[in-house]
C-alpha cells in the first residue's frame, strides 16, 4: 500500500 506517499503528495 502507498497511503502515506499519497498523503505526502497531497501536502506538497
Swiss-Prot record:
One CC-aspect GO term: extracellular region
Keyword Ribonucleoprotein on entry: no
Record GO biological process: defense response to bacterium; killing of cells of another organism
Tissue-level expression: Expressed by the skin glands.
Keyword vocabulary terms for this entry: Antibiotic, Antimicrobial, Cytolysis, Secreted
Major location (coarse): secreted
Role description: Has lytic activity, but has no substantial hemolytic activity. Has antibacterial activity with a broad spectrum against various species of bacteria including both Gram-positive and Gram-negative groups.
Name of the protein this chain belongs to: Grammistin Gs B
Gene source species: Grammistes sexlineatus
Amino acid at each position: 500500500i502507498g497511503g502515506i506517499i499519497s498523503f505526502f503528495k497531497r501536502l506538497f
